[in-house]
Amino acid sequence: MAETTRLLVDADACPVKDEIYRVGARYGLKTVIVANSWMNIPQSPLIERVVVPEGPDVADDWIAEQATPADIVITNDVPLAVRCLAKQTSVLRPNGEEIDERSVGMVSAMRDLMQGLRETGAVTTYNPSFGKADRSRFLSALDTLIVRLRRKAALARTVPSSSQTIHRPVPGDVP
């Protein structure tokens, strides 16, 4: 049986939660909000709140353990993205950038570079401001990713597995 796509949200600092709720409802997707503190979420059978204990990477650990190849993880956390990609889970940043096998190396290198620059005091800001263009880019990327995963799941349902392959004898075949 094919797994159903869920939206797993690293929610503590996620600026696009409202957008995620709307897109999840439009597609009928289960949305799991994971945080280390209680958050107000819309009342919906499709939205689940998971409050994990406080501590470094506890929410990340929960998401990484629960993620499947059918899911979409929404996070800005690069180490979490790397862990999810290892499980073939799709990863989307709140700015609409998809992190995949092709981009993860550059994203990781940029994270390490910026962290080093912050530690030396060469850079003092963490993130640029988040605006309408970022929200729009995120919505477009999330729609595209959901459609791609649905097509992939539909294709997987129509392609017979090797156990379903029918062998028709050809004249001259030896049983």
Curated annotation (Swiss-Prot):
Question: Span of the secretion signal?
Answer: none
Q: Which NCBIfam families match?
A: PRK00124.1
**Family statement drawn from the similarity comment of this UniProt entry:** Belongs to the UPF0178 family.
Q: Which PANTHER family match?
A: UPF0178 PROTEIN YAII
This protein is called what? UPF0178 protein GOX1710
Native species of this protein?
Gluconobacter oxydans (strain 621H)
